[in-house]
A protein has these predicted regions:
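Residue-level recognition of single "structural anchor" positions
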Residues: 1-222
Length: 222
C-alpha cells in the first residue's frame, strides 16, 4: 500500500487533471480531442469526463425532489439508433426517456421502461404540483394520461404549433439539443446512458459554458 503522502499526491494529480479537462467538457470537445490537446492518454481523458458526469448526476439526483408548478410540458422520446418517422414508442433497441419541462425554468429527465400510463403517471404526480397547467402533444403517449388533477391542454401541431402559449416548444427544444449532443459519441451503451442524459439535462439547465464551468468547479471541488 502506498504511503498516505503518495495517495494525497495522486489525488491532487487527478484533481488537477479534472480541472484541466473541465473547460473542454463544457465546450463539448470530445475526450479524445481533449486528450490530444492536453497531451494525455485518451483513456485518461475519458475517465476524467466520466468523473465529471458522475458528479453532475449526483447533484441532479439530489435536486430531483423539486416539484414543478406553473405551465409545464411533459413528453417522452426514444434515444438510440435510427428509425423512420416520428418518435417511436419504445422501439426495439431504443431507450425511452420521459421529460418534464417547466416553462422558463428547468427540465427533468428520467429513463423509463416504457411510455405506458402506469409508468409515466407516477412521475407526473411526483414532479408536478396539482392544478398546474400541463401542455402535452396530442400525438404522444402523454396525451392519453389521466391528468384530471391538472389543467390539461392538448397540442395539435398542425393547428396550434405557432400559438404563443399553446405549444410544447420547450421540451421539443430539449430533445433536439440532447440528441445533437449525444450524436457525436457514436453510440452509448445502455448502462452508461443515464449519465450522458444527465449531462444533457445539465447543459440545458445551466446556460452558458462559463456558468457551467463555475458550477462544475464548485461541484468537483477544483
Amino acid at each position: 500500500m502506498l504511503p498516505s503522502k503518495y495517495e494525497d499526491n495522486a489525488l491532487q494529480i487527478k484533481e488537477k487533471s479534472t480541472e484541466r479537462t473541465a473547460p473542454f467538457f463544457v465546450l463539448e470537445v470530445t475526450a479524445r480531442s481533449a486528450a490530444d490537446i492536453l497531451g494525455i492518454h485518451p483513456n485518461s481523458a475519458a475517465l476524467f469526463y466520466r468523473k465529471i458526469r458522475t458528479v453532475i448526476n449526483h447533484h441532479l439526483v439530489l435536486a430531483a425532489d423539486e416539484v414543478f408548478e406553473g405551465p409545464v410540458e411533459p413528453d417522452e422520446s426514444d434515444f438510440g439508433g435510427r428509425r423512420k418517422g416520428r418518435r417511436g414508442r419504445g422501439a426495439a433497441g431504443k431507450v425511452v426517456v420521459f421529460g418534464i419541462l417547466k416553462r422558463n425554468g428547468r427540465v427533468y429527465t428520467v429513463v423509463v421502461d416504457n411510455a405506458k400510463s402506469e409508468t409515466l403517471l407516477p412521475v407526473i404526480k411526483k414532479k408536478i404540483m396539482p392544478d398546474s397547467i400541463v401542455y402535452t402533444d396530442s400525438l404522444s403517449s402523454c396525451d392519453k394520461l389521466d391528468v384530471s388533477g391538472f389543467i390539461h391542454y392538448r397540442i395539435n401541431h398542425s393547428k396550434e404549433f405557432a400559438d404563443r402559449q399553446n405549444h410544447i416548444n420547450g421540451i421539443e427544444n430539449f430533445w433536439n439539443q440532447a440528441k445533437r449532443v449525444l450524436r457525436k459519441y457514436n453510440g452509448i451503451d445502455r448502462k452508461s446512458f443515464p449519465l450522458f442524459l444527465k449531462e444533457c439535462e445539465f447543459r440545458f439547465n445551466f446556460g452558458t459554458p462559463s456558468r457551467q464551468l463555475k458550477i462544475l468547479q464548485d461541484w468537483c471541488g477544483i
